[in-house]
Protein backbone atom coordinates (compact mmCIF):
# COMPACT_ATOMS: atom_id res chain seq x y z
CA UNK A 1 0.00 0.00 0.00
CA UNK A 2 1.18 3.52 -0.77
CA UNK A 3 2.13 5.60 2.25
CA UNK A 4 2.13 9.38 2.60
CA UNK A 5 5.29 11.19 3.67
CA UNK A 6 4.91 14.15 6.06
CA UNK A 7 4.57 17.31 3.90
CA UNK A 8 6.92 19.34 6.14
CA UNK A 9 9.71 16.75 6.47
CA UNK A 10 9.56 16.13 2.71
CA UNK A 11 10.21 19.83 1.97
CA UNK A 12 12.60 20.78 4.79
CA UNK A 13 15.44 22.93 3.49
CA UNK A 14 13.64 23.37 0.16
CA UNK A 15 10.63 25.57 0.85
CA UNK A 16 9.94 24.77 4.53
CA UNK A 17 12.02 25.78 7.54
CA UNK A 18 12.74 23.83 10.73
CA UNK A 19 10.43 24.60 13.66
CA UNK A 20 13.26 23.98 16.16
CA UNK A 21 16.42 25.90 15.26
CA UNK A 22 19.48 25.17 17.41
CA UNK A 23 22.60 22.99 17.47
CA UNK A 24 23.98 20.79 20.23
CA UNK A 25 26.09 17.65 20.44
CA UNK A 26 25.87 16.42 24.02
CA UNK A 27 22.44 17.79 24.95
CA UNK A 28 20.64 16.96 21.69
CA UNK A 29 18.23 14.30 23.13
CA UNK A 30 17.44 16.46 26.17
CA UNK A 31 16.70 19.50 23.98
CA UNK A 32 14.44 17.52 21.63
CA UNK A 33 12.47 16.20 24.61
CA UNK A 34 12.32 19.65 26.21
CA UNK A 35 11.08 21.20 22.93
CA UNK A 36 8.24 18.66 22.90
CA UNK A 37 7.34 19.48 26.52
CA UNK A 38 7.48 23.25 25.87
CA UNK A 39 5.11 22.95 22.90
CA UNK A 40 2.65 20.79 24.86
CA UNK A 41 2.78 23.19 27.84
CA UNK A 42 2.20 26.34 25.75
CA UNK A 43 -0.51 24.67 23.67
CA UNK A 44 -2.36 23.66 26.84
CA UNK A 45 -2.19 27.18 28.32
CA UNK A 46 -3.22 28.88 25.04
CA UNK A 47 -5.81 26.34 23.90
CA UNK A 48 -8.38 29.00 22.90
CA UNK A 49 -5.91 31.45 21.34
CA UNK A 50 -5.89 29.90 17.84
CA UNK A 51 -2.22 28.86 18.15
CA UNK A 52 -0.97 27.34 14.90
CA UNK A 53 2.80 27.03 15.22
CA UNK A 54 5.45 27.26 17.95
CA UNK A 55 9.00 27.83 16.68
CA UNK A 56 11.90 27.39 19.12
CA UNK A 57 15.37 28.95 18.90
CA UNK A 58 18.14 28.44 21.47
CA UNK A 59 21.26 30.52 22.13
CA UNK A 60 23.32 29.95 25.27
CA UNK A 61 20.93 29.29 28.13
CA UNK A 62 18.10 31.36 26.63
CA UNK A 63 15.13 30.04 24.68
CA UNK A 64 13.23 32.14 22.13
CA UNK A 65 9.66 31.17 21.25
CA UNK A 66 7.94 32.48 18.11
CA UNK A 67 4.17 31.97 18.45
CA UNK A 68 1.98 32.12 15.33
CA UNK A 69 -1.60 32.79 16.38
CA UNK A 70 -4.90 33.93 14.89
CA UNK A 71 -5.80 35.81 18.10
CA UNK A 72 -2.71 37.73 19.28
CA UNK A 73 -4.81 39.85 21.68
CA UNK A 74 -5.53 36.79 23.84
CA UNK A 75 -1.84 35.80 23.92
CA UNK A 76 -0.53 39.29 24.74
CA UNK A 77 -3.38 40.47 26.98
CA UNK A 78 -4.14 44.00 28.17
CA UNK A 79 -0.84 45.92 28.48
CA UNK A 80 1.08 42.66 27.97
CA UNK A 81 -0.17 41.04 31.18
CA UNK A 82 -0.90 37.60 29.67
CA UNK A 83 2.39 37.26 27.78
CA UNK A 84 4.35 38.24 30.90
CA UNK A 85 2.41 35.61 32.89
CA UNK A 86 3.23 33.01 30.23
CA UNK A 87 6.93 33.95 30.38
CA UNK A 88 6.95 33.54 34.18
CA UNK A 89 5.11 30.19 33.98
CA UNK A 90 7.67 28.91 31.46
CA UNK A 91 10.57 30.10 33.62
CA UNK A 92 9.17 28.32 36.69
CA UNK A 93 8.37 25.12 34.76
CA UNK A 94 11.64 24.72 32.82
CA UNK A 95 14.15 26.82 34.79
CA UNK A 96 15.30 28.84 31.76
CA UNK A 97 15.02 32.41 30.51
CA UNK A 98 12.42 32.77 27.74
CA UNK A 99 11.85 35.53 25.21
CA UNK A 100 8.51 35.51 23.37
CA UNK A 101 7.54 36.85 19.96
CA UNK A 102 3.94 36.82 18.68
CA UNK A 103 3.09 36.73 14.97
CA UNK A 104 -0.49 37.23 13.76
CA UNK A 105 -2.00 34.84 11.22
CA UNK A 106 -3.93 37.08 8.83
CA UNK A 107 -5.99 34.34 7.17
CA UNK A 108 -6.74 31.54 9.66
CA UNK A 109 -9.19 30.00 7.13
CA UNK A 110 -6.21 28.74 5.07
CA UNK A 111 -3.99 27.67 7.98
CA UNK A 112 -4.10 23.86 8.00
CA UNK A 113 -3.50 23.44 11.75
CA UNK A 114 -6.25 25.91 12.68
CA UNK A 115 -8.63 24.33 10.15
CA UNK A 116 -7.98 20.86 11.64
CA UNK A 117 -8.58 22.14 15.18
CA UNK A 118 -11.77 23.89 14.04
CA UNK A 119 -13.12 20.62 12.58
CA UNK A 120 -12.14 18.74 15.76
CA UNK A 121 -14.00 21.27 17.92
CA UNK A 122 -17.10 20.93 15.72
CA UNK A 123 -16.97 17.13 16.07
CA UNK A 124 -16.73 17.50 19.86
CA UNK A 125 -19.88 19.67 19.71
CA UNK A 126 -21.58 16.77 17.86
CA UNK A 127 -21.76 18.48 14.47
CA UNK A 128 -22.10 15.89 11.67
CA UNK A 129 -18.61 15.10 10.33
CA UNK A 130 -19.57 15.54 6.65
CA UNK A 131 -21.11 18.94 7.35
CA UNK A 132 -18.03 20.02 9.33
CA UNK A 133 -15.68 18.91 6.54
CA UNK A 134 -17.65 20.54 3.71
CA UNK A 135 -18.10 23.80 5.61
CA UNK A 136 -14.36 24.22 6.30
CA UNK A 137 -13.37 23.13 2.79
CA UNK A 138 -15.65 25.75 1.21
CA UNK A 139 -14.28 28.44 3.57
CA UNK A 140 -10.67 27.57 2.71
CA UNK A 141 -11.43 27.75 -1.02
CA UNK A 142 -13.26 31.04 -0.55
CA UNK A 143 -10.24 32.62 1.17
CA UNK A 144 -7.71 31.71 -1.50
CA UNK A 145 -6.72 28.06 -1.01
CA UNK A 146 -6.05 26.45 -4.41
CA UNK A 147 -6.92 23.02 -3.06
CA UNK A 148 -7.76 21.32 0.24
CA UNK A 149 -8.10 17.73 1.42
CA UNK A 150 -9.59 16.69 4.78
CA UNK A 151 -9.68 13.21 6.33
CA UNK A 152 -11.51 12.10 9.48
CA UNK A 153 -10.63 8.72 11.02
CA UNK A 154 -12.31 6.88 13.89
CA UNK A 155 -15.78 5.84 15.04
CA UNK A 156 -17.55 8.39 12.86
CA UNK A 157 -21.15 9.12 13.92
CA UNK A 158 -20.75 6.50 16.67
CA UNK A 159 -20.32 3.58 14.24
CA UNK A 160 -19.26 0.22 15.67
CA UNK A 161 -16.36 -0.13 13.23
CA UNK A 162 -13.84 2.70 12.81
CA UNK A 163 -13.34 3.99 9.28
CA UNK A 164 -11.76 6.88 7.36
CA UNK A 165 -13.77 9.42 5.36
CA UNK A 166 -12.19 12.12 3.21
CA UNK A 167 -13.25 15.12 1.19
CA UNK A 168 -11.23 17.09 -1.36
CA UNK A 169 -11.78 20.21 -3.42
CA UNK A 170 -9.25 21.53 -5.95
CA UNK A 171 -5.68 20.29 -6.52
CA UNK A 172 -3.48 18.93 -3.71
CA UNK A 173 -0.19 17.79 -5.37
CA UNK A 174 1.57 16.06 -2.44
CA UNK A 175 4.50 14.75 -4.53
CA UNK A 176 5.42 18.11 -6.09
CA UNK A 177 8.31 19.59 -4.09
CA UNK A 178 7.76 23.17 -5.25
CA UNK A 179 4.10 23.02 -4.13
CA UNK A 180 3.40 25.02 -0.96
CA UNK A 181 1.50 22.41 1.07
CA UNK A 182 0.35 23.30 4.58
CA UNK A 183 -0.47 20.33 6.84
CA UNK A 184 -2.33 20.14 10.14
CA UNK A 185 -3.47 17.41 12.53
CA UNK A 186 -5.89 17.50 15.47
CA UNK A 187 -7.82 15.05 17.64
CA UNK A 188 -11.49 15.28 18.56
CA UNK A 189 -12.27 13.62 21.90
CA UNK A 190 -15.86 12.41 21.56
CA UNK A 191 -18.00 10.12 23.73
CA UNK A 192 -17.33 7.31 21.21
CA UNK A 193 -13.54 7.74 21.29
CA UNK A 194 -10.89 9.83 19.57
CA UNK A 195 -11.39 10.96 15.97
CA UNK A 196 -8.24 12.02 14.09
CA UNK A 197 -8.50 14.97 11.70
CA UNK A 198 -5.87 15.64 9.01
CA UNK A 199 -5.86 18.65 6.69
CA UNK A 200 -3.71 19.41 3.63
CA UNK A 201 -4.03 22.86 2.02
CA UNK A 202 -2.37 23.71 -1.31
CA UNK A 203 -1.50 27.42 -1.53
CA UNK A 204 0.19 27.49 -4.95
CA UNK A 205 3.72 26.90 -6.20
CA UNK A 206 6.90 28.40 -4.73
CA UNK A 207 9.20 29.07 -7.68
CA UNK A 208 12.84 29.02 -6.60
CA UNK A 209 15.26 30.92 -8.87
CA UNK A 210 17.97 28.24 -8.60
CA UNK A 211 15.49 25.50 -9.47
CA UNK A 212 14.29 27.46 -12.52
CA UNK A 213 17.85 27.96 -13.79
From Swiss-Prot:
Disulfide bonds: none
Any one of the GO BP annotations: translation
Gene3D superfamilies linked to this entry: 3.30.300.20, Ribosomal protein S3, C-terminal domain
Superkingdom to which the source organism belongs: Bacteria
Pfam families referenced in this protein's UniProt entry, alphabetically: KH_2, Ribosomal_S3_C
Keyword rRNA-binding: yes
InterPro entries: KH_dom, KH_dom-like_a/b, KH_dom_type_2, KH_sf_prok-type, Ribosomal_S3_C_sf, Ribosomal_uS3_bac-typ, Ribosomal_uS3_C, Ribosomal_uS3_CS
Entry keyword set: Ribonucleoprotein, Ribosomal protein, RNA-binding, rRNA-binding
Cellular component GO terms, alphabetical: cytosolic small ribosomal subunit
GO molecular function, one term: structural constituent of ribosome
Residue ranges annotated for the KH type-2 domain, each copy included: 38-106
Homology family: Belongs to the universal ribosomal protein uS3 family.
Assembly: Part of the 30S ribosomal subunit. Forms a tight complex with proteins S10 and S14.
Function text: Binds the lower part of the 30S subunit head. Binds mRNA in the 70S ribosome, positioning it for translation.
PANTHER family in the record: 30S/40S RIBOSOMAL PROTEIN S3, SMALL RIBOSOMAL SUBUNIT PROTEIN US3C
Name assigned to this protein: Small ribosomal subunit protein uS3
Organism field: Desulfovibrio desulfuricans (strain ATCC 27774 / DSM 6949 / MB)
Gene symbol of the encoding locus: rpsC
Amino acid sequence: MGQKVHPFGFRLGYNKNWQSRWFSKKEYPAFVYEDSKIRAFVKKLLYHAGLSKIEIERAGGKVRLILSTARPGIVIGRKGVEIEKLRNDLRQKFGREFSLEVNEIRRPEVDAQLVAENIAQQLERRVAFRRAMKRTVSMARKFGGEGIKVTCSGRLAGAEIARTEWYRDGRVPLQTLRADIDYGFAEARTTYGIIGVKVWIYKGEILDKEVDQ
